[in-house]
Amino acid sequence: KIIVKGIGTITYDLAYGGAFYAYVDLAKNDFPFDLTKEHYQQLINTGMKIKNGIMNTDHSIKHPYEEDLNFLYGTIFIDNNKQASGSDSKNVCVFAEGEVDRCPTGSGVSGRMAIHKMRCDLDIGDIMTFESITGSIFKGTVISEQLYGSFKSVIPQVEGTAYITGMQTFVFDPKDSIKNGFMLR
């Protein structure tokens, strides 16, 4: 739990599935909105306040082996009620600097699979379907459990649809002394 200025006490789960997310279940919190397009601005504003509140107070966001992943990427609001579409759950991912994902978020679904497996909500091989704010669907399952170093983990499988939205061609001049890239830190 965390107290977020202007919102109040927020109950959330923290999980990693390629990035760290705060999973905020609507049933465990009191929000004046639901997960619909009409409330996207409230979702963004609230999601960013929660993310910033957690980042400013929760110093437990530490990846055990990759220091550059020691941050909260976003807030995922979840509604675990069966949806009219037939999906098991609906979620909205507010990430980065206030963007909303068009899909249920692959890394977010991976983290949710870990949460559901930890709570014994599902067994290996059980399939859950997740719907996004746009209506797109991902399916997730846990295919195995294993140790990641000394940490319990799951190997999730996520299935969804992706669409090509553009193409890019990069070129470099062979005389460019940093044509292979550079990094400043």
Walk through the language-model features, giving the residues of each:
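Active-site proximal loop and beta-alpha junction motif in alpha/beta enzyme cores
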Residues: 1-185
